[in-house]
C-alpha cells in the first residue's frame, strides 16, 4: 500500500523531469515542451504554483501523477489554481492513488497559504468521493463545456 511518503515532488527529482514530461504528454497530448517549461517554472516559483507530483512503483516506473497550474485551458482564470493532469496507470487504479495525490497536493497548497483549489473534468462522482464539490460548468479554450470542481485546501 502506498502512503504520502511515496509521493515525489518533481522539483526534488530533476533526473525524472524529462521522463515525467514524456509520460504526461503520452496521457494528455500536451507538448513535452509545455510540461518541461512548467516544471522549470516550478523550480523558481515561491508560490507553490506550478508544481508536479508523481508516484513511482518499486521499479521506478511512473504509475500516477498530477500537476498544479494557474489555468487548465479554460476561460475562468479567476478560478485558480487548477489541479491538472490527474492520471493513474490502469493496473494501479482503485487503490486510492488518485485520492492520495489529491489530498497531498491540497496539503501542499495549504502550506503555501493557498486555501482553494479547482479542477476541470468530464468525470462525474469520482471527485465528490475524494472530497471535492461541483462548482460550475466552465468553457474550455476549445469551446467545450466541462465540470469545474472546488476544494478548500485547509
Features from the language model and the residues they span:
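Conserved beta-strand in the GNAT
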Residues: 54, 61-71, 82, 87
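Short hydrophobic/aromatic beta-strand or adjacent loop that forms the aromatic wall/cage
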Residues: 50, 143-149
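Conserved acetyl-CoA-binding loop-helix of GNAT-fold acetyltransferases
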Residues: 85-88, 94-107
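A conserved beta-turn-beta hairpin within the catalytic core of GNAT-like acetyltransferases
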Residues: 71-83, 93, 141
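Short, well-ordered beta-strand micro-motif
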Residues: 54-56, 67, 148-152
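Short amphipathic alpha-helix that is part of the acyltransferase structural core
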Residues: 1-39, 43, 47, 52-56
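Conserved active-site alpha-helix within GNAT-family acetyltransferase domains
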Residues: 111, 115, 121-145
Amino acid at each position: 500500500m502506498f502512503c504520502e511518503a511515496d509521493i515525489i515532488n518533481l522539483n526534488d527529482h530533476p533526473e525524472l523531469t524529462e521522463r515525467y514530461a514524456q509520460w504526461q504528454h503520452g496521457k494528455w497530448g500536451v507538448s513535452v515542451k509545455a510540461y518541461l517549461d512548467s516544471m522549470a517554472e516550478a523550480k523558481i516559483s515561491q508560490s507553490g504554483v506550478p508544481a508536479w507530483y508523481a508516484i513511482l512503483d518499486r521499479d521506478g516506473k511512473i504509475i500516477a501523477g498530477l500537476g498544479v497550474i494557474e489555468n487548465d485551458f479554460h476561460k475562468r482564470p479567476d478560478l485558480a489554481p487548477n489541479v491538472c493532469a490527474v492520471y493513474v496507470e490502469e493496473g494501479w487504479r482503485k487503490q486510492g492513488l488518485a485520492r492520495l495525490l489529491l489530498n497531498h497536493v491540497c496539503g501542499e497548497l495549504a502550506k503555501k497559504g493557498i486555501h482553494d483549489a479547482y479542477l476541470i473534468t468530464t468525470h462525474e462522482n469520482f471527485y465528490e468521493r475524494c472530497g471535492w464539490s461541483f462548482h460550475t460548468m466552465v468553457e474550455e479554450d476549445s469551446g467545450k463545456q466541462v465540470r469545474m470542481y472546488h476544494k478548500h485546501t485547509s
